[in-house]
Amino acid sequence: QRQMCIRDRQSALLEAMQERQVTIGNETFGLPKPFLVLATQNPIEQEGTYPLPEAQVDRFMLKVVIDYPKLEEEKLIIRQNINGDKFEVKPILKADEIIEARKVVRQVYLDEKIEKYIVDIVFATRYPEKYDLKELKDMIGFGGSPRASINLALAARSYAFIKRRGYVIPEDVRAVAPVSYTHLTLPTNRE
């Protein structure tokens, strides 16, 4: 029963992430734009935690690991929570501004040489021996999917946009690679 509920939830999340819609009963509803999914991931060893299927992991563009807060930050967290301080979140962008920014990011120039660089990085996770990385062959269960290449290219374009450039350079790709495709390269010992 519990496994069925988890599968149903995962299926619903996949539908939302891939098709930008949700289905309730026999009725389908389109999701508003912009639509994005932010998720947290607990260690798999924790009770009540289940590994995401590969198809679901593959749909996340980035995986950002956030470490514990620094000493002073944690003291501030304590003060804010025990004093009952209200956290005020103020919007900094409107939905239409996010949609417009996404359009501009997609116009950032990506040269064919940078495209090849991106594809080589992802292909090296699939065929490490062809890239003189034989020692990685037994460590990688599944190399990055085509979506890993797409995500790396989009992340590099976004980084160039943030750096106020209309074109991608290799440093942009290197800057975003650790967060944009490593979670899509599954180790052989994944449980």
Identify what each model region corresponds to.
Residues 7-10, 49:
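Conserved ATPase-coupling elements of RecA-like P-loop NTPase cores
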Residues 9-23:
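P-loop NTPase nucleotide-binding module
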Residues 6-7, 32, 53, 111:
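GHKL-family ATP-binding catalytic core of two-component histidine kinases
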Residues 19-93, 99-106, 157-159:
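Canonical AAA+ ATPase core
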Residues 82-184:
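Basic, amphipathic alpha-helical bundle interface domains used for macromolecular binding and assembly
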Residues 1-8, 182-191:
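Conserved small/polar residues in nucleotide/adenosyl-binding loops
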